[in-house]
Amino acid sequence: MEDGRWKMSMKFEDLESWQKARALVNGVYTLTRTGSLARDYGLSNQIQRAAVSIMSNVAEGFERVHIGEKLQAYNVARGSTAEVRSLLYVIEDNFPGSASSAGQLRTEAVAVGKLVTGLIQSTESRKSKLGSLLSTLFSLLSPV
């Protein structure tokens, strides 16, 4: 569904990137509610917010009408995937009991990042095609 084909009836919940981001959020919440990590409120809160940001910005970008706004939201989502991955290294390094789960979630975050990059590339392609179409149209309408 995220290969550039767009349907009027499609919802952000239909996007694979949003679905995978939602699963990542659930994994992050599960991880941060266990063991000594549950007592590190600052780190837990930060990674939770970053994970939610991915999911929310994919949804927001999909619902935006203007291509520039779509790209901005998708780029924020992509940046948040990097933040989640980085924070998972902090967890892995400082909470040995959570290292395995952190590594698994980092793999999921990489996959989500690739899907978000696909959304960005698809949107940029549509922007480029629209620009070319408008340029051609204006050249045809311009008086000689």
Task: Report residues per predicted region.
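Short, C-terminally biased terminal segments at protein or domain edges
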Residues: 1-144
